[in-house]
Amino acid sequence: MLEQVMVLAIILSFLITVILSPLFIPFLRRLKFGQSIREEGPKSHQKKTGTPTMGGIMILLSIVVTTLLMTRKFATLSVETYLLLFVTIGYGLLGFLDDFIKVVMKRNLGLTSRQKLIGQLMIAIVFYFVYQRSGFSTALHIPGTDLSINLGFGYVLLLIFMLVGGSNAVNLTDGLDGLLAGTAAIAFGAYAVLAWNQGQYDIAIFCVSVVGAVLGFLVFNAHPAKVFMGDTGSLALGGAIATVAILTKLEILLVIIGGVFVIETLSVIIQVISFKTTGKRVFRMSPLHHHYELIGWSEWRVVVTFWAVGLLFAMLGIYIEVWI
């Protein structure tokens, strides 16, 4: 029965997004919610100016509806389910505010870095206080072993870092048509397998709901994209994947399963440090996906390559936890 529920959850969330998109995209166009493309980006991206953004609203709606329907009917609406939805919606609303300022108020930078960080920290802190009341453990599991390290208060700092850092890392990856939708589907698919293996079926249902939602979105977001998810989608997905890693106690594995997000973030950090210390850039442009565009790769080639790398990372993560 539960196997059927997982399949139903993917199908339902996929269909919700696919059915909503043809209705919602023209609505975004009428409101003139078009994406602004930064001038310092690859020149090939200038033609994307005006493409409807804030499509992450459809992803969020699909995830929430599917998760609530499926967990209420076939599993339990646990504290973990509510925490997952809280963080996903919370970071989604923060992203929506950022998108709204960029698109509607015509302030290209959106929220300032400080404003965004304060919002991310507030959501992370609320998550911590609710989570710790449910009797959470401060032990950090070592993947592939029966060992764990009790971090004490250090775990609280790790938890907050994961939520803030995870949302930003995933946000950085959302720079090419279909790139984030595909890599997110792979990462959440891997965590669905691991949550199922632990018997945490409510978390597994949430994960497959995300998979279905982003795959449905990919139908319209693949190159050439008809809609972008915006920060509404990318921040929500980043917060969600970090929360899943925390609730399954597979925090370290996020570095592997979310390897593409980690690499993208490291490319930005390396680029900034190199330029500030030596005046030279390591990459043509960061995040890394733009570097490959500027050395001559087509956008589709970059995206498919990153999907493949993400799939390898996901399989490695599952192998380490399940079979070692």
UniProtKB/Swiss-Prot annotation:
Its main location: membrane. One of its GO terms (cellular component) is plasma membrane. One of its GO terms (molecular function) is phospho-N-acetylmuramoyl-pentapeptide-transferase activity. The chain crosses the membrane at residues 5-25, 50-70, 77-97, 117-137, 147-167, 176-196, 203-223, 227-247, 250-270, 304-324. Its EC number is 2.7.8.13. It comes from the Bacteria. It is a multi-pass membrane protein. GO terms for biological process: cell division; cell wall organization; peptidoglycan biosynthetic process; regulation of cell shape. Signal peptide: none annotated. Pfam families: Glycos_transf_4 (PF00953). InterPro entries: Glycosyl_transferase_4, PNAcMuramoyl-5peptid_Trfase, PNAcMuramoyl-5peptid_Trfase_CS. The keyword Ligase does not apply. This is Phospho-N-acetylmuramoyl-pentapeptide-transferase. It comes from Geobacillus sp. (strain WCH70). The lineage of its organism: Bacteria, Bacillati, Bacillota, Bacilli, Bacillales.
